[in-house]
Amino acid sequence: MFCVQCEQTIRTPAGNGCSYAQGMCGKTAETSDLQDLLIAALQGLSAWAVKAREYGIINHDVDSFAPRAFFSTLTNVNFDSPRIVGYAREAIALREALKAQCLAVDANARVDNPMANLQLVSDDLGELQRQAAEFTPNKDKAAIGENILGLRLLCLYGLKGAAAYMEHAHVLGQYDNDIYAQYHKIMAWLGTWPADMNALLECSMEIGQMNFKVMSILDAGETGKYGHPTPTQVNVKATAGKCILISGHDLKDLYNLLEQTEGTGVNVYTHGEMLPAHGYPELRKFKHLVGNYGSGWQNQQVEFARFPGPIVMTSNCIIDPTVGAYDDRIWTRSIVGWPGVRHLDGEDFSAVIAQAQQMAGFPYSEIPHLITVGFGRQTLLGAADTLIDLVSREKLRHIFLLGGCDGARGERHYFTDFATSVPDDCLILTLACGKYRFNKLEFGDIEGLPRLVDAGQCNDAYSAIILAVTLAEKLGCGVNDLPLSLVLSWFEQKAIVILLTLLSLGVKNIVTGPTAPGFLTPDLLAVLNEKFGLRSITTVEEDMKQLLSA
């Protein structure tokens, strides 16, 4: 096992990365190794997808499957070894079908890629794990060095984050052939074990630029189906009655669940990154979408244990449900998996609803505590002139984009302290689950404009980018000249690709934490600092002083 993709990876003087019987996320060495094997199979599939496009062959089954299966290897998504192998088998079957299509056009069709003809050696998980050793990401570290390995992983993990957003968009009916062609090209190239530093750096920026387009179609999918988010108050306390909790990012799953629970007497609560769903008109119209439950994903083993109903996980993040003994009432959907947990293959939630009706639910309603969400792209752009006016009248000094992933590391209290230290004449724009560090606190307003503005999920960084570009255009300056600072927390691969997106768009002087990614060496961090001004957090006082004086 070698895995260094998330923020909680093991760090030692000898090197970074989880390489024992189990990773810090709870992923076993077996599952981790089989995910490496799956990635190799997907790289071979992409190699043939690139070749097929040369012949004008575009196989939509391949295009939809590839990023979805890649998404299953993202942190805290799928811990179920047999399902990972199932994805690998499906990848090979699709590859062979695509290969046959190519050969039907050109009998001499060939692909020069080491993954292009990969076959699984056995049905036995142990033998497959041994085969997977050929594809361990750091297998040639001694030959290429830590810097090249780090850049490879930056590209691989960034592309994995983009693949997750591609799947979220595809679920909502969004498909862009150019994006998929670019995805396959990059995925196939990474399967050749590239070792050119400049080419890898260029690739990382290409992934960021591609992901901006992915976020654009995801935004179109969400707003096209569910309307543009508008500011909405959400109760974060319990309402009496039977209940279901839904977590993850998949708004379509939430919509289907709301439709199927309507009139059943079962209330629905959002968790984690589902919180922004309350801002969408076509979702909040369901009166039994009663509120948001819990805090950051890392607290779920305590909070889920206390929730008196079933739980549905639609995407990341799931962690071991046996710890809180709620594994008999947590359900996985789509690419999510945990051994022994019931999985919903389709969009029928009747079994979950039946379980909710058999459980006690919340016995009484607590005193409501309301927070505000729903500052989507349209709302943010509508406020652009107000922001400019407040800045011109010196009522608004600075905007801090304070968001990203949450996690368990104690140093993450930095983000709570930072939020509460932001001066009263400054505004906080937040997104993603890092907001749970401070989103239930009171921040007041500036002439009626809330000082805490929740823009949505991690992918809604797109809205923040569009706002920044709009403000810069209206003020006749560059984005980096705005009174705007980005202080971002990271945990997994979606955060990595958001960072690459920002860097590829030329955004500079981003501050990140709580730690630097374990796969980035001091040399690589120095390069990123020199090129983009990217740096790690220090202390709240020092960072605040520096950002306000910039």
Curated annotation (Swiss-Prot):
The catalytic activity of this protein is classed by the Enzyme Commission as 1.7.99.1
Task: List, separated by semicolons, the cofactors it needs.
Answer: [2Fe-2S] cluster; hybrid [4Fe-2O-2S] cluster
Which keywords fit this entry according to its UniProt record? 2Fe-2S, Cytoplasm, Iron, Iron-sulfur, Metal-binding, Oxidoreductase
| Cofactor binding note from Swiss-Prot or TrEMBL | Binds 1 [2Fe-2S] cluster.
Provide any one GO MF term from the record: metal ion binding
List of residues binding [2Fe-2S] cluster: 3, 6, 18, 25
Its catalytic activity? A + NH4(+) + H2O = hydroxylamine + AH2 + H(+)
Under CDD domains, the record lists: HCP
An example of a Pfam family matching this protein is: Prismane
Name of the top EC class for this enzyme: oxidoreductase
- Residues modified to Cysteine persulfide: 405
What InterPro entries does the annotation carry? HCP/CODH, Hydroxylam_reduct, Prismane-like_a/b-sand, Prismane-like_sf, Prismane_a-bundle
Q: Where in the cell is it found?
A: Cytoplasm
Query: Where does this chain mainly localize?
Result: cytoplasm
Its family?
A: Belongs to the HCP family.
- NCBIfam families in UniProt: hybrid_clust, PRK05290.1
Q: Known PANTHER family for this protein?
A: HYDROXYLAMINE REDUCTASE (PTHR30109:SF0)
Name of this protein: Hydroxylamine reductase
Species this chain originates from: Escherichia coli O139:H28 (strain E24377A / ETEC)
Instruction: Give the gene name.
Output: hcp
